[in-house]
Curated annotation (Swiss-Prot):
One GO MF term attached to the UniProt entry: magnesium ion binding
Known role: Catalyzes the ATP-dependent 2-thiolation of cytidine in position 32 of tRNA, to form 2-thiocytidine (s(2)C32). The sulfur atoms are provided by the cysteine/cysteine desulfurase (IscS) system.
EC number: 2.8.1.-
Subunit-structure text: Homodimer.
Swiss-Prot/TrEMBL catalytic activity: cytidine(32) in tRNA + S-sulfanyl-L-cysteinyl-[cysteine desulfurase] + AH2 + ATP = 2-thiocytidine(32) in tRNA + L-cysteinyl-[cysteine desulfurase] + A + AMP + diphosphate + H(+)
Metabolic or biological pathway, per its Swiss-Prot or TrEMBL entry: tRNA modification
CDD domains: TtcA-like
InterPro entries referenced in this protein's UniProt entry, alphabetically: Rossmann-like_a/b/a_fold, TilS/TtcA_N, tRNA_Cyd_32_2_STrfase, tRNA_thiolation_TtcA_Ctu1
Keywords: 4Fe-4S, ATP-binding, Cytoplasm, Iron, Iron-sulfur, Magnesium, Metal-binding, Nucleotide-binding, RNA-binding, Transferase, tRNA processing, tRNA-binding
Protein's name according to its UniProt entry: tRNA-cytidine(32) 2-sulfurtransferase
Named cofactor requirement(s): Mg(2+); [4Fe-4S] cluster
GO biological process: tRNA thio-modification
Source organism, top-level taxon: Bacteria
Amino acid sequence: MNKQSRKAQYNANKLQKRLRRLVGQAIETFNMIEDGDRLMVCLSGGKDSYALLDILLSLQKHAPVKFDLIAVNLDQKQPGFPEHVLPHYLESLGVSYRIVEQDTYSVVKRVIPEGKTTCSLCSRLRRGILYGTAEELGATKIALGHHRDDILETFFLNMFHGGTLKGMPPKLLSDNGRHIVIRPLAYCREKDLETYAHLKAFPIIPCNLCGSQANLQRQAIKAMMKAWDKQFPGRLETMFRALQNVKPSHLADSTLYNFQGLQKQESPFPEGDKAFDEEVFLESQEKSPPFHGSKIRVLQFK
């Protein structure tokens, strides 16, 4: 092995260790996986869900808690969908899996006018089917492959177009109250997952088989973030850190903070502010390393 090959192998191992560490941190911080859990890992055939399954399988061997997992793919009968790819890949890994066949494609095409975005209806149908599958399989958690950039994109979409400060939480209770959904890749950057997918040579299935128009709002947000990341290295890390450092007393939601009940007091007030001072931020703050929670105990994997 020559010097260039050794360097490439070193970088690949370094990336793999970093992704495993970040997933372990997310699992620990949000108590995503508990002893005896049965995870339903949703596998779409995209880079993120492949990486999620790969990393969870690796961590499963060394985790301090015992858990089972089963990979689930929803075949929505989109024309041209390569039905053999996922079964062949999963069987090569020896992973338990379930392919759920539901022709939601025809339903969506019948309901949504030609040329319109089908993603919203498609996702609602998919969610209902996957919830039902989780119950059938006895899954205690549903694992999705959303990463840090997805979380930030959703935050800006909701703020710019929905008028709400809401992101995509690493762990949530489903709308029907019967399922816990986890996102173990919450601390992982998309560009790292792209590199990882290339190194692992995952058999990627295109995501545009349905022929739907791209979500233009999300594409605009993605382009904005990509430009920021290029022009201001570290800005995305700072923004993600902000989602973990919320101060309701310094926002304007009276349902989260009792503004009406504020009273003067003689002693210093921890949530007080210097009302007449302008906020000053150091330029170096945008170059700070990623933040993944303070004073947390990280799951250790060998």
